[in-house]
Every structure is written in C-alpha cells, then in structure tokens.
Amino acid sequence: MDDYAVLSDTELAAVLRQYNIPHGPIVGSTRKLYEKKIFEYETQRRRLLPPNSSSSSFSYQFSDLDSAAVDSDMYDLPKKEDALLYQSKDYNDDYYEESYLTTKTYGEPESVGMSKSFRQPGTSLVDADTFHHQVRDDIFSSLEEEGKDRERLIYGQDSAYQSIAHYRPISNVSRSSLGLSYYPTSSTSSVSSSSSSPSSWLTRRAIRPEKQAPAAALGQDRQVPLWGQLLLFLVFAAFLLFVYYSIQAEEGNPFWMDP
C-alpha cells in the first residue's frame, strides 16, 4: 500500500474511477480507506487474471498533473471479470447504490458506463419501493377525493352555511319577508331533504339566547316582583326607625330631674 501513498489526491481519484470504485472527496481521513480499497481490488484482480498477464503488477506513471498519461489497456478489465470481482468480494449492493447516488466525484465528470454498472444491482429494489410508494399515494389521494365529495354533498348546496346566522332559527314569515331562500324549509328539493345535517342546524338553539336563558328563568321564578321587594324593605326600615325613636322618648334624659 506504500505505492499509493505517493499519489496525489487527483491521481488517486483517477485510479478509483478507473477501477469503478465509488468514492467521495478525498481528504486526510478517507485517503487510507480508498488506498485500502484499491489494494484489495488489485489483490483480487491478480487472483482472477492469468499468471502471465502483463498487467499483474501495479505501475502508475504520471508525467504531469495537467497532462496525465495513463496506460488505459493496463487497467481496462472485461465486464465479466468485473462482475466476478465484485461477486467474490461480496460487496453490499445497497451500499454501492447509496454511496454512488449520494456522493459526487470532484474535479472530473462521471462516465455514463459507471452510472449504469453501479445502478444495476439496486434497480429492482428501487423500482419496487417506488411502486409501493406510488400505490400508497394513489390510495391516500383516492380517500381524500372521497372525503371531499362527501363534504360537497353536505355543504356544497350553498355557501351561506359558514355564517353564524344559520344557528338562529327564523320563522317562515320573517324568512319570506327578508327573502332568505337559503334556509331549508318543508318544501325543499330532494337533495336537501335527504341530508339530515341542514335540518339539524335549524333545531339548534341560538347562542346568545342560551346565555340569557338563566336570567329569564330566574325572573319568572320570582313570586314577588323586584319593586315590591324594595317597597317591603323600605317599610321594614321605617318600622325599625320608629321603634328606635319611641324607645328613646320613653327613657328620656337621665340628667333631667322633676322640680
């Protein structure tokens, strides 16, 4: 692995792309991991290739960072050998799918062949998950549409139900005089008569009269009116005052003496 330590970050990224190894930005903490992956890849490659292969040894020469002359024939492997290599390594397909889709190669564009080769292992799983999510979304959307249709049947007959005035019952005379045709009556259409919600609105009592109802009931329960109670209180007070003055007159002044 010492041979990879002399490579720069750009050169190491080129080797990773050449071997179709997914990678992210090369920093100090991830460089050792990528060097280890390249070393394992080279080891497996030597086992799969014939002994007399000229590409068994690792030789990577760069003349300049801007103009990198890489022998492509040395690192190009057939697709069959690549498949055998990854199967022998027992890599996790989910890891390759996630790492390739979430990471981005910095510095150089990605090749189309790499994206196809790494997306193939998880294509069936992604398609299955997408299908299940689509079916679930369709079910939820159908349920929402059914709920909206029910609301339209109940509340869609007129837009005046949102007002607080529908809680106040109005007689037929006042309704006809005011010209309020949106209150359901006994001669409504078949749609309004079939629904029980509009008829239940009229049976509700008014909000404000309910708050005033206890006071009205208290006034009806009184046997003596309020003015009568005040009159009795004044008479009783006058009687007590008369008794007090009469007692004071009988006792008289204790310092007063008869001549």
Curated annotation (Swiss-Prot):
Q: What is the superkingdom listed in this entry's lineage?
A: Eukaryota
Under SMART domains, the record lists: LEM (SM00540)
Transmembrane regions listed in the UniProt entry: 224-244
BP terms from Gene Ontology: cellular response to growth factor stimulus; negative regulation of canonical Wnt signaling pathway; negative regulation of fibroblast proliferation; nuclear membrane organization; positive regulation of protein export from nucleus; skeletal muscle cell differentiation
Alphabetized PROSITE patterns for the sequence: LEM
Tissue/organ expression: In the ovary, highest expression is seen in primordial follicle oocytes (at protein level). Detected in embryonic fibroblasts, skeletal muscle, heart muscle and tongue epithelium (at protein level). Widely expressed.
Extract the ranges annotated as region (Interaction with CTNNB1).
168-187
| Keyword presence, Disulfide bond | no
Query: PTM Phosphotyrosine: at which residues?
Result: 161
Residues where Phosphoserine occurs?
8, 29, 54, 72, 88, 99, 141-142, 171, 174, 176
State the compartments where it is located.
Nucleus inner membrane; Nucleus outer membrane
Record GO terms (molecular function): actin binding; beta-tubulin binding
The membrane topology term of the UniProt record is: Single-pass membrane protein
Question: Where is this protein chiefly located?
Answer: nucleus
Q: What happens when the gene is disrupted?
A: Early and highly significant depletion of primordial follicles.
Give the sites modified to N-acetylmethionine.
Answer: 1
Which InterPro entries has this protein been placed in? Emerin, LEM/LEM-like_dom_sf, LEM_dom, LEM_emerin
Q: What does this protein do?
A: Stabilizes and promotes the formation of a nuclear actin cortical network. Stimulates actin polymerization in vitro by binding and stabilizing the pointed end of growing filaments. Inhibits beta-catenin activity by preventing its accumulation in the nucleus. Acts by influencing the nuclear accumulation of beta-catenin through a CRM1-dependent export pathway. Links centrosomes to the nuclear envelope via a microtubule association. Required for proper localization of non-farnesylated prelamin-A/C. Together with NEMP1, contributes to nuclear envelope stiffness in germ cells.
**Quaternary organization:** Interacts with lamins A and C, BANF1, GMCL, BCLAF1 and YTHDC1/YT521. Interacts with TMEM43; the interaction retains emerin in the inner nuclear membrane. Interacts with ACTB, SPTAN1, F-actin, CTNNB1 and beta-tubulin. Interacts with SUN1 and SUN2. Interacts with TMEM201. Interacts with NEMP1.
The protein depicted here goes by the name Emerin
Q: Which organism is it from?
A: Mus musculus (Mouse)
Q: What is the lineage of its organism?
A: Eukaryota, Metazoa, Chordata, Craniata, Vertebrata
